[in-house]
Every structure is written in C-alpha cells, then in structure tokens.
C-alpha cells in the first residue's frame, strides 16, 4: 500500500518484525549483497547500548534530498545491513513502534521500510564504517556525473558489497557496476553440496 522505488520488494518489510526471533542479536543482510570475508568481527562488535548498528546511506549522505518525515537533517542509514540488539527491541517493543510509524507516515516512502526504521531510530543508532555495507549505487551515480571524488570506489574489496539501486549484476541492461566481477566470481564458483 506504500509508494516506493520499484526495486524494493514487499519482503523488505519483514525485517520490521525481527524482534520475534528467539535470539538476542541478529545480523540482517539484504539478498543483493556479496560477503567477501568473515563477519565475525561485525557480529561480535560492541554496540555500546544502541538498538541497531548500520552504515549511513552513501547516496543520501552526499546529495540534497527530502525525506517524507523530515529526516534530511540527521544521518540516515541504509537498512540493507543491520546489526540488531533484539533483546532491546523486545524490551522497548520496537515492532509496535515501527507499525505505529507505518500508520502515521506519509504513504510515499521511497526507500520502503528503511524510512520507518530511520524514523524510529533517529539519532539512536551506531554508525559503522562504509565497508560493512558498501553501496555500489552511490559509486555508479557519482561516476556517471564525473564526481567520483565525492564517493570513490575503494582500492580493496570491501567485506560487504551491496548492489543498491535497480543496477544489479544479474540484470544485463545496466552498464558499469562497481565490483560486478566479484558478484560473477561467486556466481560462477563451484559450491559443494551441503
């Protein structure tokens, strides 16, 4: 029922109910990501009392934009990778807060559930370095406009590559996508039977 960007699926909203999982900590990862190294250091990170740890949205942090709830004045995270303190979510009934936000926010939520999460956790989230959710869409956007200095592609492969926007490696109608070769390396790898 919400208007959002076409590449954001209904399934993205499922993470709003994470507090019902029978664990105290969870690491949520979008399905359009490639993990290139162990996430042990990320998962065992000291969250310093925050209910969620995430990476700032790389595109929105570097552009002028208007968020339907007025969050353009505060750091806004990308919800593709979330380290979540579920015990704290249950204690504060975050699911109810998210659902309440969903009923009161404007029906135009360009970034789907990410808008609700940023509204509820405004100024109450731990900001992680960009390599934990390296968002390829930002690099592609700025490179096309000869502004690669705004958000350069790193020299090393980040631990988490997030193929944000509609430009996905498996969709052949898009041009140069940062770290597309990493996606194809994993796609073409021989995977042992489980």
Region annotations inferred by a language model:
Residues 1-20:
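Active-site-proximal specificity loops/subdomain of glycosyltransferases
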Residues 2-3, 61-66, 137-138:
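Short, charged, surface-exposed secondary-structure boundary motifs
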Residues 4-7, 66-72, 146-150:
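Short, P/G- and charge-enriched loop/turn segments at secondary-structure junctions
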Residues 26:
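Short aromatic/hydrophobic "clamp" motif used to bind/position activated sugar donors
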Residues 29:
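Catalytic metal- and UDP-sugar-binding loop of GT-A-like glycosyltransferases, i.e.
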Residues 33-67:
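Conserved donor-nucleotide/metal-binding helix-loop-beta segment in metal-dependent transferases, i.e.
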Residues 70-81:
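A recurrent flexible, glycine/aromatic-enriched loop bordering the glycosyltransferase active site
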Residues 84-194:
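A glycosyltransferase accessory/donor-loop signature
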């Amino acid at each position: 029922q919400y208007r959002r960007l076409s590449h954001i699926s209904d399934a993205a909203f499922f993470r709003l109910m994470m507090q019902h999982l029978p664990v105290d900590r969870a690491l949520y990862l979008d399905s359009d990501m490639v993990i290139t190294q162990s996430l042990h250091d990320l998962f065992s990170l000291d969250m310093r009392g925050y209910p969620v740890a995430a990476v700032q949205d790389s595109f929105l942090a570097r552009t002028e934009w208007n968020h339907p709830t007025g969050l353009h004045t505060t750091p806004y995270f990308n919800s593709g990778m979330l380290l979540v303190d579920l015990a704290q979510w249950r204690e504060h009934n975050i699911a109810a807060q998210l659902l309440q936000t969903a009923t009161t926010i404007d029906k135009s939520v360009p970034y789907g559930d990410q808008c609700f999460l940023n509204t509820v956790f405004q100024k109450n989230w731990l900001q992680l370095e960009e390599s934990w959710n390296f968002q390829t869409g930002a690099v592609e956007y700025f490179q096309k406009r000869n502004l690669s200095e705004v958000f350069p592609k790193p020299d090393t492969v980040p631990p988490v590559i997030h193929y944000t926007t509609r430009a996905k490696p498996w969709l052949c109608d898009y041009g140069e996508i940062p770290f597309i070769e990493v996606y194809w390396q994993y796609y073409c790898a021989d995977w042992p039977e489980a």
